[in-house]
Swiss-Prot record:
Catalyzes the first intracellular reaction of sulfate assimilation, forming adenosine-5'-phosphosulfate (APS) from inorganic sulfate and ATP. Plays an important role in sulfate activation as a component of the biosynthesis pathway of sulfur-containing amino acids. The active site is at T196, R197, N198. Residues 394-502 are annotated as: Required for oligomerization. It is found in: Cytoplasm. It catalyses: sulfate + ATP + H(+) = adenosine 5'-phosphosulfate + diphosphate. One of its GO terms (biological process) is cysteine biosynthetic process. The record marks F328 as: Induces change in substrate recognition on ATP binding. This is Sulfate adenylyltransferase. One of its GO terms (molecular function) is ATP binding. The keyword ATP-binding applies. InterPro entries: ATP-Sase_PUA-like_dom, P-loop_NTPase, PUA-like_sf, Rossmann-like_a/b/a_fold, Sulf_adenylyltr_euk, Sulf_AdTrans/APS_kinase, Sulfurylase_cat_dom, Sulphate_adenylyltransferase. Keywords: Amino-acid biosynthesis, ATP-binding, Cysteine biosynthesis, Cytoplasm, Methionine biosynthesis, Nucleotide-binding, Nucleotidyltransferase, Transferase. It comes from Kluyveromyces lactis (strain ATCC 8585 / CBS 2359 / DSM 70799 / NBRC 1267 / NRRL Y-1140 / WM37) (Yeast). The lineage of its organism: Eukaryota, Fungi, Dikarya, Ascomycota, Saccharomycotina. Its EC number is 2.7.7.4.
Amino acid sequence: MPSPHGGVLQDLVARDASKKAELLEIAQSGDLTSWSLTARQICDLELILNGGFSPLDGFLNQQDYQSVVEKSRLQNGLVWTIPITLDVDAEFASQLSPDQRIVLLQDNEFPLAILTVSDVYQPDKAVEAKKVFRGDPEHPAVKYLFEQAGEFYVGGSLEAIQLPVHYDYPGWRKTPAQLRLEFESKQWDRVVAFQTRNPMHRAHRELTVRAARSNNSKILIHPVVGLTKPGDIDHHTRVRVYQEIIKRYPNGMAQLSLLPLAMRMGGDREAVWHAIIRKNYGASHFIVGRDHAGPGKNSKGVDFYGPYDAQELVESYKNELDIEVVPFRMVTYLPDEDRYAPIDEIDTDKTRTLNISGTELRNRLRDGGEIPAWFSYPEVVKILRESNPSRPKQGFALVLSETLPAQLKTALLSTFLQYGGGRHYKVLEHGNNEEILALVPDFVRSGTGLILQNASSLKGTNVFKIGEESGSDIPLETEDKNILHIVQRVVLFLEDQGFFQF
C-alpha cells in the first residue's frame, strides 16, 4: 500500500479529537466570526479534514495558490494540480486579518472547523482560468470562477470539529483512514481504483475486472457523490446502481466507497488530482479514462481536452505520485461469442460488435425502448427507469401567453383529464409569486402536468411556451383565439413529443 501524498495522512479529525469539546465550545460561543460554507466548499473541507487531500491541512495561502496555478506544485515542491481555496465576498473579506480565527459552518448551523487566517488575497481569476482550465468561457469551472466564486480567497490552517453531516449512505462513506485499515486487515496490498460519475453497466464491470487481473490487484469502486458535471444523473440513482453492480463481482474482489469530491471537470490536471486522492485512500493503481474528467465540447464545438491528455499527464508524474496508471481499455460486446473483449484486440472488419452510446441509452430510457441484458443488468435498468421515466410518465409545464383567454386553462385541464394514464394535472395560479414559481421544476420532476399563465421567464426541462410571441414552443397565429383549435394544437404537440400515446 502506498504512503499518503507527502508521507503523512493529514487526518485532522483524528489529530484534533482530544480537543473537540473545547473547539466546539469556542465555535458555539458567538465570539468568533463565522462563514457559512457553499456546497463546493463543504466537499473540499471534508476531504481536507479526513486526509483525502493530504498533504493539505487547510485552504491554500497565496504563495501555495500561485505555485499550484503556475507550476502544479505546492511551495514545498510536492505535486498538486488543482487549487483548493476558500472563496468569500468582499464584505466578508474586509472583516478578516492574519491570525484571526473563524468558524466554518455547514448550513449556517453546524460548526465543522475553525480556520486560523494566514492571509486574504484577491486572485487573478483570468490567470487561474487559463492556466488551470485552459480558459474557455464555457468550461464549467471557468463559469464557476466568474459567476459564483467570491472575489477574495482566504488561506489558513484548520482545526477539525467534525466531518460534514450526511444523512445518506453512512455505511458507504469511508474515510482514507477507514479504507486503509480495511485494506490492511484484508491484506489488500494492491488495489486498483476506478473513478466514475456515471452509472455503471456490464462493460464497466468487465474493464475493472480485467484491470484487476492484469495487475494482480483488488478493485475499489470509488464514485464521486459530491458535485459533478451539471446535468449528470443524481448521486442517489447512481449509488443504487453501484450497490447492485458490486454484487456482480467475484466475492472478495471489489469494494465500494463513496467519494465526497467536488469535481472541477479539469481534464488532465484533474486526473493527476484524482490519482493523488486515490493514493491517499490506499489505492496502488488508478484507472485513467479516455478524456478523463473532460466536460465535453468547448465554445468552438471541440473537446476541451484531447482524448489521451489525462493519461499522458498522470504518466509524466508517475515517479513522484507513487501510484501506477492503468489506461482505460474500452471493451465491446461480441454477440456471436456472448462476451466482452477489449476493442483494440478485435478486428472489427471480421468480428461483429455491439455497443450502446450514452446518447442512445438516454433516448431508450426516454422512449421506453429496450435496454438489452448484454448491455446492463436488469436490476440496474430497473433503477434507471425509475429515476428516468419514459416520456408518457414524465411531467411537463405549459406556459400560456398572457394574451390568451383564461378559459384555455380550463379547456386544457379538462381535455387532459379525459385521457387518464395516471398523470396528475393541475392549473397553477401563482400571482407572480417567485416562491410558487420555484416549485414548478419539482412538480414536473414528480410527473405532474402543469398549466399556468403569465410566467414568460420560466425555463427548464419539459417547460413549453404557448403563444404568438417569437420563440414560443407552440406558436399560434395572432388572430387565432379559438380555444378548440388551440387545444388541438397543444395535444398534437404533446403527442409528437411523446407525452401522450394514443
